[in-house]
Regions:
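Enriched for short, Lys/Arg-rich terminal
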Residues: 67-86
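Short, surface-exposed coil-to-beta transition loops
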Residues: 59-63
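Basic, Lys/Arg-enriched alpha-helical interface segments
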Residues: 1-55, 71
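Residue-level signature of transmembrane alpha-helix interfaces in integral membrane proteins
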Residues: 18-21, 65, 76
């Protein structure tokens, strides 16, 4: 599986996810690339709720990504905390 990051994702990732947690997220997506909820009307974008240490899923972050099965790639579009967007 190949991960492709947008600039905004890379910037926000450094704010929210330490390297070890980011690797956990990548490993999770490798094993379950369709885990996120499909966002209607986007052509296949998915939203994944990801828990941060001691915060659980509700207090964690949301990861927006696109899984392109034909190329075996996951495009990491953006991420945000629940407080940042609803």
């Amino acid at each position: 599986m190949v991960f492709v990051e947008t600039r905004i994702f890379t910037k926000k990732c450094s704010l929210y996810l330490p390297d070890d947690e980011f690797r956990e997220l990548q490993n999770f997506l490798i094993n379950k690339p369709n885990a996120g909820t499909l966002i209607q009307g986007t052509g296949g974008l998915r939203k994944l709720r990801w828990s941060l240490d001691n915060k659980g899923k509700r207090g964690g972050i949301r990861v927006i990504y696109y899984w392109q099965l034909s190329k075996n790639q996951i495009y990491l579009m953006t991420l945000y905390s629940k407080n940042e967007k609803t």
